A protein has these predicted regions:
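Carboxylate-rich, polar loop motifs that coordinate divalent cations or form catalytic acidic clusters
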Residues: 1-175
């Protein structure tokens, strides 16, 4: 529970996503930053809380194969954090030649069976191809959530439909 003026508590009671990382810590995406509960020591850390220049509302969390935490915000894209320190490693969107989406409103982040990271929201669906260390953008409708249907196939739950996306060809089929 959030306790005002207590830094050793949840940063905000409005929790949008919960993630248990590979070390057993619990991460919370909230309406006022990201909180991490270090279960073994019963200590709390909070990131991006009350920051006017950065995101505050976070909706999505995912851990990649390297142990980094990907966090999607409702106003300023997505962030990659060092799991051990909570330090921001990178913030997207930024000027990268292969990130073609504006991608500021992130609803979900998902790791598929190949370890690639899928990011989706109000704009496009973006896949970070981990082996190639580059982004690929798929044109799609505004989406809420997704999951891997089978290797190379993603189910996308969009605002007005459900889609099946073929990762290799980029073909999108309405279901």
């Amino acid at each position: 529970t959030h306790q005002v003026n207590n830094p050793n508590s949840l940063g905000n009671d409005n929790v949008n996503k919960i993630l248990e990382d590979s070390k057993g810590d619990i991460w919370f995406a909230t309406n006022n930053g990201i909180s991490r509960w270090r279960v073994a020591t019963n200590e709390w850390d909070t990131y991006y809380q009350n920051k006017q220049e950065q995101a505050q509302v976070f909706l999505a969390l995912c851990e990649d194969d390297e142990g980094n935490i990907w966090a999607g915000s409702f106003s300023s894209g997505f962030y990659v954090l060092d799991r051990n320190t909570g330090k921001e490693l990178v913030h997207y969107p930024r000027n990268t030649s292969d990130l073609k989406s504006d991608g500021k409103f992130i609803m979900n982040i998902y790791k598929d069976s190949e370890g690639d990271i899928w990011i989706g929201g109000i704009q496009d669906v973006i896949c970070y191809l981990t082996k190639e260390k580059r982004f690929h953008t798929y044109g799609a409708q505004p989406m809420r959530t997704f999951m891997e249907f089978s290797p190379g196939k993603m189910l996308l739950a969009c605002t007005y439909s459900v889609l099946l996306l073929d990762k290799e060809t980029g073909k999108i089929t309405f279901l």
